[in-house]
Amino acid sequence: MVIIAGVTGVGQSDPSVAASVKDFLLAWESGNYSAAAALTTGRPDSVIQSLRSSYSQLGAQGLVLGMGPITVQGSTAKAYFNASIDLGRGGPPWTYQGHFTLRRHGNGWLVEWSPAVIVPGLGAGDRLAVLTTVPARRPLLDSSGKSLIPPSPTVEVGVRPGRVTNPVATATKLAKVTGLASAEADQVVGQIRAAPPNAFLELIQLSPRRFAHLSAALGKVPDLTHRWVTRRLFRSAVPDITGQVGTEATKQLVQDGDPYRPGTTVGLSGLQQAYQAALTGTPTTEVVVQSESGHQVKVLRRWKGQSGTAVKTTIDLAVQQAARRALSGLGFSGAVVAVQASTGRILAVAEHQAGGLPRVDPLDGQYQPGQAFTIVPTAALLSKGRIGANSRIPCWQPSRVGGQNFVNIPPVPRLKQRFSVDFAHACSTAFTELARLLNPAELSTAAGQFGIGVPWRLPLRPSPFIGSIQKPGSLGETAADSIGTGTVLVSPLDMALAAGVVESGSWHPPSIVTSPSGPTLTSGDKLPVRFKNHVISQLRQLMAGPVKSGAAQAARLPGEKLYGQVGTAPLVGHHKVKTVWFVGFRGGVAFAVVALSRSTAFDPAVLVARDFAEFLPAS
């Protein structure tokens, strides 16, 4: 409805001029262009075309017109009006003041027609256009400021708007091929109509793989074209952390209220999604007048956008490369997660899928850690003074505790009856028997001191798994939990942080972003109580044993000592597949290696751990 904002200067004897102005603005606003044209001096077909095209050229989603002052001098009058146009881009409307002249015609008044009636300064043959300049997506950086997203080939799919014969058909078929919703297809129509006719209008960016998959279908979209460019978008040195980008509007983006335009590259997971708004910034939008030849005549309105902000992470590309190299020769699926033991900063996250086995999720996976978890009951027993490295603890075979039978998997050779030897060889039955010395609360408390189940968060989507252990309800359950089976579930990240406890003396919540910063512990949570120094000292000595003379001897390296513990457990949901672990630290870097295998041998994880430790940069 036309808003009347004060009519002034109209003679009392002739109020019809105000009625003519109101009728013209109302017809124009409502899209009744024939009625509007009949109230002008112009050729009806020309006026109708001008009014209709000006609206479509802007891709407008709404128009509101309001009357302003009117002055009358004899047989002529000058009317001012206010226009507010919704450009459909989630930003403020374009508002301006226009004016036109009216001439007395018989008993009424007609608008003296020219293109300038629509917008002041619009001349014959001119057209309106909306230019949107999207700032380049800002990078995700490693701890030294190097980009985690290397340049890679990218396909920009778009149109030359002046060559599109049917924008609706083009947008509808593009939406069908790429999965855009019908409402988004309508926005694409608006983009095509509003853009300069001769410039390439990018509608969507695709990775080479995605383009190859869709190319046949895209080839059937009328008037569509594409070009190859190089962008930092679709490849990543750390995909588990950075996440993926694409053009889909995810539910989370809608819930977050992030500005989204069809074809815009958005983060779909990981840090790319969590920091979508920061990385993309906001576009610069201009409403311009262009000549018939496509040259820009003037800028009518400009909304200046803002560049995005780079996000700096804790990732160390040298450590990441060491993890990837260590996994590259593995014939099975596996993963490596490394953290700075003294801070919890995540240094590397790598995974490798092979051997027809499922992928290992280094952050959100939920796995039983097997004997690698024995560092937890060991710390609990050392804290209470119930055992020491030289305690006489036989490696039973088999063991029956709390009505449950336990055996050593893989088999353990005949050992000296000393706890340090049991630990070095990951003797499961020694720990199931030692469960008799623990009450259920002591084991779950110790697990919490290693960060298992402690509420923390990272700015990643989906959120990583924090680990879990239920309070055992019986001696048999305590025994099963003591060897990392039973109710114990962890991710590789959880166990890397647990290894960091032994190296640094206390647990630190993980962090992945240093700028902009954010909390890692959930509100109101406190850090776990740290172990006493003598407990950590004894635990370190015990963790030297597996590599020096125990189940992980294959990981022995010259130079700085490598500490660790191994483990194996069935892969949840895959009884014939085992998870094989090495959890340890060297030179301030704590890490966890997980490999899937169809055997119970520790070697796959041990050999990856050896290579990773060897490839680590000198500290």
Question: Which sequence ranges carry the predicted segments?
Answer:
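C-terminal region of N-terminal signal peptides and the immediate post-cleavage residues
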Residues: V2-W28, Y33, W507
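Second-shell loop/turn segments in exported
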Residues: G11, D23, A38-L39, D86-R89, ...
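Short solvent-exposed beta->alpha transition segments
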Residues: Q12, S16-A19, S30-Y80
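Small/polar-residue-rich segments within soluble enzyme cores
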Residues: N82, T95, R103, L110-S114, ...
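Hydrophobic/aromatic beta-strand elements that line small-molecule binding cavities or substrate pockets
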Residues: Q97-R104, W581
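Short pre-catalytic segments that frame enzyme active sites
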Residues: V117-V134, P139, L148-V159, V164-V168, ...
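Beta-lactam-recognizing serine transpeptidase/beta-lactamase-like catalytic domain environment
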Residues: Q290-L300, S333-G370, A380-S597, A601, ...
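Short, gly/Ser/Thr-rich active-site loops of penicillin-recognizing serine hydrolases
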Residues: S523, V606-S619
